Amino acid sequence: MLQACRVLRSRAGPSPGSWQPLSFDGGAFHLKSIGELTRALLVLRLCAWPPLVTHGLALQAWSQRLLGSRLSGALLRASIYGQFVAGETAEEVRSCVLQLQNLGLRPLLAVPTEEEPDSAVKTGEAWYEGNLSAMLRCVDLSRGLLETPDPTGNALMQLKMTALMSTRLCKQLTSWVRRPGDSLELSPERLAEAMDSGQDLQVSCLNTEQTRHLQASLSRLHRVVQHARAQRVRLLVDAEYTSLNPALSLLVAALATRWNSSGEGGPWVWNTYQAYLKDTYERLRWDAEAADRAGLAFGVKLVRGAYLDKERETARLQGTEDPTQPDYEATSQSYSRCLELMLTQVSHRGPMCHLMVASHNEDSVRQATKRMWELGIPPDGPVCFGQLLGMCDHVSLALGQAGYAVYKSIPYGSLEEVIPYLIRRAQENRSVLRGARREQELLSQELRRRLLGRGLRVSPH
């Protein structure tokens, strides 16, 4: 956990005179204890070791057999779980978030539940209804974690749609949406009306059982957003695989039609756009223009993307075109274009357009802060930044100290719930974990400074 010390920080942001680039040299690491620095360094080095990531679940099972559940669990809590997870109980989560808030950072809670593609078919709605209850509790917890009791304040929360509906249904809807002319039967307006009224929805591409599940899924989504709106919690819907995303985007559009209207106070439902996909810029541009024409608020979380290896392997096995950018440089260029598009949208539409720059890349963060200054976007306004809990703290802390709105994505739950989730995220984010070498250098440097009195810092690059 981050050291619980109250620090002085600027809420006004950068000077209005000339733009000063942020320095990500690890200077803000002085806010962390030696124990926190040591654990972060060890865990990040472990996570950069490919065999641990590849065989994580098998290694966890082996450690339980060898050491027993209690000792194995204690080791995980002292290492990976303690680094990346807020805790299991509401009190543990509050304690973690308080420490983040003391450092100028904000919580973005995530329920670590999702349905993997092609997982076993679930009988009935019980599993999804249980996840609905967890999501509603997360909304309440997110609201309760606001730094001030101001009733007009807003919290943010992540939402995995595949915790509330079957991935098989998502694939079925995706194939239907992609068929020219047939997608009108599943328009966002029709789905929004079905959510609001609760009336039966007839869809020709689905059988009776699938239609019943779609109806139940729409009801669950509606209940989550309705409760989040009442509690003033904005929902950031996660993007997933390309085989699911068109269906997820359709449902986000339906929710936006109902909850992102101009009289609702900004976007309550945001979509996530993955810059590593070739078509992302055009989709983002089209969606932004469509929202503007319809008078809807527009919320975007912009990420590079986490499913690169799986997307390429799926395309190879199916003999289809690879949907991803050819290399990291192309992905970075795509991210930069999408970022410029959205910052321009924010400058034109003001509070009707919100953006989270969800990136661990220092260049992308610098580009965002510079363009915000050039466009006159306040640092604590409709643009915020996001990084994972336990990673990229040298960027998060520098942003927070400069007065920018910075969120840490925070999973919480029991070891049994969270460790498989963390291992899946690690497998999807191999490049991010391998790319954390600079953060490891900065952590090592701060430890040397503390223990040996060496004051040199790694130069920014």
Curated annotation (Swiss-Prot):
Its cofactor is FAD. GO terms for cellular component: mitochondrion. It holds the Pfam family Pro_dh. GO terms for molecular function: FAD binding; oxidoreductase activity, acting on the CH-NH group of donors; proline dehydrogenase activity. Transmembrane segments: none annotated. It is an enzyme of class 1 (oxidoreductase). It catalyses: trans-4-hydroxy-L-proline + a quinone = (3R,5S)-1-pyrroline-3-hydroxy-5-carboxylate + a quinol + H(+); L-proline + a quinone = (S)-1-pyrroline-5-carboxylate + a quinol + H(+). The keyword Acetylation applies. GO terms for biological process: proline catabolic process to glutamate. It comes from the Eukaryota. Pathway: Amino-acid degradation; L-proline degradation into L-glutamate; L-glutamate from L-proline: step 1/2. The modification N6-acetyllysine is found at K310. Its EC number is 1.5.5.3, 1.5.5.2. Keywords: Acetylation, FAD, Flavoprotein, Oxidoreductase, Proline metabolism. The keyword Flavoprotein applies. PANTHER family: HYDROXYPROLINE DEHYDROGENASE, PROLINE OXIDASE. Belongs to the proline oxidase family. Dehydrogenase that converts trans-4-L-hydroxyproline to delta-1-pyrroline-3-hydroxy-5-carboxylate (Hyp) using ubiquinone-10 as the terminal electron acceptor. Can also use proline as a substrate but with a very much lower efficiency. Does not react with other diastereomers of Hyp: trans-4-D-hydroxyproline and cis-4-L-hydroxyproline. Ubiquininone analogs such as menadione, duroquinone and ubiquinone-1 react more efficiently than oxygen as the terminal electron acceptor during catalysis. This is Hydroxyproline dehydrogenase.
